[in-house]
Structures are given as structure tokens and as C-alpha cells.
């Protein structure tokens, strides 16, 4: 049976770092799939964008078509090996927040778990300011908190349409990265029984 763990969190929360470290410690090998990469590859093929950060500025209907194509690819991969799906639950666009997974997309993927990585708005803002490699929109702490609140609401909606369990992992500066990584490893190790 396919085993898919979605891992989400807003930009700057530390999601990619936690994911990379957790995958080194799991009892079974996961295929790390970045949902945005799958969408970006398709958008480049269609000549819609040249840079990944342009994706959120695409027309919402175009984004939804790209999402459905990516979901179909995830299902194909998960038939053979467990998937850790690195993604965003919601995407901030100039017109408002776009759900990362409309109903038909989440029903296609049907993840087993939805893991949300969170931190305080001030921690996220500080991390974003230190990461100059990415072209990110500037947000206030209030906007960052709103985005995290919307991610929780989106995760509940996704769970309703996929029967997934929701796990919230906090990645605070004082808590330590190690604890957040260990929490994710515990979730990922549940896949062992599915691929024995």
C-alpha cells in the first residue's frame, strides 16, 4: 500500500533542513519528492516560467493544472517506494492565498500523514533575512502568523479528504533542531510495515 508523508511549512521555518536530516536516520529509504519541483518542471516545459519563484505569480487556474499533473506523478512513485512529499500547504499569491492541494489533488495523493513544521514569526523572519539566495516577498510577523494559521486550517481540510493524520512539529531556536528531526523520524518509521 502506498505510504506518503506530506511535510509542510511556510518559507523560512526550517522544513528542508529537518527533512534532509531526518531522511538520514529512517529505518526505510524514502523518496524525497518536492511538489514545487514537479510543478516547476512542467511549467518550464510549457514555457510558463524561467525561475521557480515566478510560480506563485502564475494564474491560479494554471497553477491548479500543474498541481494535478504533479499529484499523478506522486501516486506513480509511491506504488514502488514510500514518499516524503516536501511542499507548502498554502501559497501566498498577489491575489490571495492559494491552497497547495485543491480537493481533487489531495484526493489523488491521499497522504497517510500531514506534518506541519512551525516556528514563531520572529524566528521565521530572522531565518528569511539570513537566506539571501531566495527571492522572497517581505512579510511582517503578523502576516507570517496568518500564513501559519492558514496552513493549519488547510491541513485539516486535507485530512478530511484523505483520512490523513496531522502532526505538528515545532522548530524553535531554543528547542533545538535535533528534537524536531527526531519527531519526524518517528512518523517516517511507520512506513516500514507498508514496504516489508
From Swiss-Prot:
Domain of life: Archaea
Main location: cytoplasm
Binding site for ATP: 9-17
UniProt-listed Enzyme Commission number(s): 2.7.4.3
Catalyses which reaction(s): AMP + ATP = 2 ADP
Lineage of producing organism: Archaea, Methanobacteriati, Methanobacteriota, Thermococci, Thermococcales
A GO MF term: ATP binding
Pfam family, any one: AAA_17
Localization of this protein: Cytoplasm
Protein name: Adenylate kinase
InterPro entries: Adenylate_kinase_AdkA, P-loop_NTPase
Keyword annotations from UniProtKB, A to Z: ATP-binding, Cytoplasm, Kinase, Nucleotide-binding, Transferase
GO annotation, cellular component aspect: cytoplasm
Family membership noted in the UniProt record: Belongs to the archaeal adenylate kinase family.
Gene3D superfamilies, per the entry: P-loop containing nucleotide triphosphate hydrolases
Amino acid at each position: 500500500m502506498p505510504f506518503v508523508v506530506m511535510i509542510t511549512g511556510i518559507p523560512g521555518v526550517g522544513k528542508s533542513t529537518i527533512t534532509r536530516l531526518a531522511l538520514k536516520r529512517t529505518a526505510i529509504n524514502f523518496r524525497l519528492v518536492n511538489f514545487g519541483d514537479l510543478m516547476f518542471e512542467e511549467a518550464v516545459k510549457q514555457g510558463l516560467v524561467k525561475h521557480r519563484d515566478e510560480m506563485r505569480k502564475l494564474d491560479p487556474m494554471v497553477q491548479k493544472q500543474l498541481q494535478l499533473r504533479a499529484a499523478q506523478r506522486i501516486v506513480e512513485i509511491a506504488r514502488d517506494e514510500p514518499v516524503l512529499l516536501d511542499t507548502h500547504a498554502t501559497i501566498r499569491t498577489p491575489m490571495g492565498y492559494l491552497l497547495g492541494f485543491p480537493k481533487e489533488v489531495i484526493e489523488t495523493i491521499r497522504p497517510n500523514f500531514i506534518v506541519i513544521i512551525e516556528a514563531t514569526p520572529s524566528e521565521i523572519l530572522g531565518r528569511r533575512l539570513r537566506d539571501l539566495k531566495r527571492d522572497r516577498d517581505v512579510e511582517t510577523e503578523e502576516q507570517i502568523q496568518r500564513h501559519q494559521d492558514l496552513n493549519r486550517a488547510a491541513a485539516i481540510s486535507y485530512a478530511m479528504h484523505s483520512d490523513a493524520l496531522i502532526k505538528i512539529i515545532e522548530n524553535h531556536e531554543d528547542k533545538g533542531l535535533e528534537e524536531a528531526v527526531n519527531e519526524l523520524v518517528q512518523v517516517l518509521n511507520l512506513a516500514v510495515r507498508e514496504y516489508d
